[in-house]
Amino acid sequence: MLINQQVQSKNVPNPYLHLPSINTNDMVELMRVDKTIGVERIAGYIVTAYDTVNGDLPATLFSLLTLERHLSTKRIDRDTFNRAYIRAVMNEAAALAADNYVDYDTTSQGAISGDVQLTKSDRLRRIVSHSIADMTGRRRNRVKLL
């Protein structure tokens, strides 16, 4: 039985070598997941999250030289930047997993459960947005659009 069995550890390399990589164990610690999801699917969420977060970052952060220059001008140290980057990627991957595992059924309870899980992915993506703002030196947007 796969429920409650531990997920195997797999390092998912970042396409940009100077940016931090994430391990599937990091996702297991962030979310309550077990072997029913599978290590390859978790790794796929992380790869997609890399693409999403890297797409939201300015192009100047993809060169090691310009990244170091950015860190010195924005008064953010490398460790803080790395933590914010990991937080952004992890929460985006968690939001992707939450979106894919929304439980809808034909009962009213299923619709309520689905709505709760959608707000969970919205909260996770707000953390992603705040982390990217912290990395780039932009102000955090705290306005909720209807």
Task: Give each language-model segment a name.
Residues 71-84:
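Short, glycine/alanine-rich amphipathic alpha-helical segment
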Residues 81-146:
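Short loop/turn elements at secondary-structure junctions
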